[in-house]
């Protein structure tokens, strides 16, 4: 199994991985841009977004998931810079629904790598044990999402109180954001097998395990030609 550093420094394969890396470059440049044209709050927001784009690559998440997290994190950060949350009614709720759910799924992957929870890529969920594992993964994702949403709201309150009173906070806003984040996390939990299936580290483990075979006679994988989620064409285990 490759280390986090090895996974992060590997060469991209497939169009989606190159696009996800381009998003990371844009995020890094965005930190420089806000450092010149905006203030400390905006710099902190874009640095958090940059971190959000880097973690999926360190974890070797499948390209689709990686790209979704990067675009959502960067979009949410720039939306804050341009104050879109207060200018567009309901926009804040949509961002919480999408980003909170994706981040909850990332946290579940981190927890699995640390050995705290079972694998979120738990197959088809058939049988009592499989169904229990699937339900458990969904519940853990929702729990992570609600916890992340709470920390998010606490951060907004701290920013409003200690840094800039222009940061919008309010009871209705907080409850609505937490509810949206919880629903997004529920959806992400249900989609975990798709989101984490075919990630780089998982493919490496499957490729090196006994009995691995080519996934499909034509070498196509879940994300198109080339075999796996990002077009590597590497061996994978057939589920029987």
State each model region's role.
Residues 33-39, 82-91:
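Membrane-interface helix caps and helix-loop-helix hairpins in membrane proteins
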Residues 115-146:
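Internal alpha-helical transmembrane segments of multi-pass membrane proteins
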Residues 62-75, 92-98:
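Cytoplasmic-side transmembrane-helix entry/capping segments in multi-pass membrane proteins
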Residues 85-92, 150-186, 190:
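Interfacial helix-loop-helix junctions of multi-pass membrane proteins
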Residues 1-43:
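Alpha-helical transmembrane segments and their cytosolic membrane-interface
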Residues 176-240:
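Primarily interfacial, aromatic-capped hydrophobic alpha-helices that serve as membrane anchors
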Residues 53-57, 72-79, 104-108, 144-152, ...:
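Alpha-helical transmembrane segments of multi-pass membrane proteins
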Residues 98-118, 161-167, 182-196:
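Membrane-interfacial alpha-helical segments at the cytosolic side of multi-pass membrane proteins
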